[in-house]
Amino acid sequence: MTVFFKTLRNHWKKTTAGLCLLTWGGHWLYGKHCDNLLRRAACQEAQVFGNQLIPPNAQVKKATVFLNPAACKGKARTLFEKNAAPILHLSGMDVTIVKTDYEGQAKKLLELMENTDVIIVAGGDGTLQEVVTGVLRRTDEATFSKIPIGFIPLGETSSLSHTLFAESGNKVQHITDATLAIVKGETVPLDVLQIKGEKEQPVFAMTGLRWGSFRDAGVKVSKYWYLGPLKIKAAHFFSTLKEWPQTHQASISYTGPTERPPNEPEETPVQRPSLYRRILRRLASYWAQPQDALSQEVSPEVWKDVQLSTIELSITTRNNQLDPTSKEDFLNICIEPDTISKGDFITIGSRKVRNPKLHVEGTECLQASQCTLLIPEGAGGSFSIDSEEYEAMPVEVKLLPRKLQFFCDPRKREQMLTSPTQ
C-alpha cells in the first residue's frame, strides 16, 4: 500500500491527468444512464396508449413523419431513431417516415401526399416552414390544413419548441416530451403569416420575417468559428467597420387588428329531423328574404402609411406568447431605431442572436392584420423568414389567425389557459 501511494506521489502529473479523465468518464457514463432512463420512461408511457383497444369500426391513426437528416449538423437521424421513433411505434400509430434529400423536397411531396391523420415534422425551423408552406399551397388546403401537426425539435433553431413544450436543458428529454405530446393528442391553434412577393408563390411562416443589420451580422457568425466564444461579438464588430450608420429605408402600409370570432362549438351528432320538419324548413328558406337585402354595409378597411428608416424591421406572429383570451387577432410590426451607437449594436446584437425577440430601446411596435412592405429598387440584402434566407423584395404580409393546429404538451396548454399573457 505504501508503494502504491509512493508511486502516485512520484508521478503526480500522470495521477492528476488520470483522475480528471476518470471523473469526466464517470460523468459521461452517468449522463448516458440518465438518458436511457428517460427513454425507457417515455416508451412505457407511450405503450399505455398503444395497448388501448380501438372500436371495431375505427381505423389505426396514420402518421406521416417528414425527417430532415441534415438537421443539427447531420445528427437529426440518429436523434430521431434513438429518442422519438420508438415512442411513435409503441403508441399504436401507423407511422410512415419520409426522409428529405434536398431543400424544398417536403413542399413538393406534400402537394402529392394523400390524406393522413397526423403530420409530424422532425427537424428545425427550415423543415417546419417547408411543411407548412406545402400544406397551405395545396388546392384543398381548407380541409387539409385541419390535420394536426406535430413538431419534434431536432434542428439548431427550433423557435416553436419554447411555445409548445416545457423548457428543458436535456436534449433527450426535450425530444421525448415533444414526441409524447403528439401521442397524448392535446392541440393548440397557431397563427400563420402568408408572405407573397411580386412573382413567386406565397411562403408561409410560423415565426416571422426579419430584415436589417442585426440579421445580416447574425448569419455571418459561423464565418468566425475560429474565435470560439468571441465569434458573435466579432461578427457584429466587423459589420460596423463596413458601413455606419447602417440604415434601411422602406415604406409600409398596414391595416389594424381584426376582431377575433368566437370559438366554433364542437360538432355533436344530432338526429335527423322528420320529413315534415324538413319540408317546412325548405319552404321557409325559399320564401325568406334574400340575405343580400339584409346585409349591412361593411366599412372599408383603413390603411395607414409609414415611411421608415430603421436598423432592423421585423414582422412577427404572436405564437411565442399565446393569449387564448385575446379578443383581437394581429401581427406585430417592430421598427427599431437607427440611432444606436456601435457599442450598443455589438452588445444588443450579440444578445439578439440567442434571443431574436429582444428589441432596442425606443423600438416602435405596430399591430396589424395585414401589411405591404415596399423596398427601394437596388436596396439589396436578404430577408430571414423563419430562419431561412430569401432575397429582399416588396412583399405583402397577411395574418392567417389560428390557421393550424399543433400538438403541445398538456402542461403547457394548461399554463396558457390559466395564465394568459398580459
Curated annotation (Swiss-Prot):
**So what family is this one in?**
Belongs to the AGK family.
This chain is encoded by the gene named AGK
Q: In which tissues is it expressed?
A: Highly expressed in muscle, heart, kidney and brain.
Please state every residue range assigned to the domain named DAGKc.
58-199
Q: Where is this region: Disordered?
A: 249-271
Q: Which GO molecular function entries does the Swiss-Prot or TrEMBL record give?
A: acylglycerol kinase activity; ATP binding; ATP-dependent diacylglycerol kinase activity; ceramide kinase activity; D-erythro-sphingosine kinase activity
What membrane topology term does the record carry? Answer: Peripheral membrane protein
Q: Which Pfam families match?
A: AGK_C, DAGK_cat
Please give the pathway this protein is involved in. Answer: Lipid metabolism; glycerolipid metabolism
Induction note: Overexpressed in prostate cancer, suggesting that it may play a role in initiation and progression of prostate cancer, processes in which lysophosphatidic acid (LPA) plays key roles.
Which InterPro entries does its entry note? Answer: AGK_C, ATP-NAD_kinase_N, Diacylglycerol_kinase_cat_dom, Lipid_Phosphate_FormReg, NAD/diacylglycerol_kinase_sf
The protein here is known as: Acylglycerol kinase, mitochondrial
- What does this protein need as cofactor? Mg(2+)
Top-rank EC class of the record's enzyme:
transferase
**Known EC number:** 2.7.1.107, 2.7.1.138, 2.7.1.94
Q: What do the Gene Ontology cellular component annotations say?
A: cytoplasm; cytosol; intracellular membrane-bounded organelle; membrane; mitochondrial inner membrane; mitochondrial intermembrane space; mitochondrial membrane; mitochondrial outer membrane
| UniProt-annotated stretches for the region Hydrophobic | 15-31
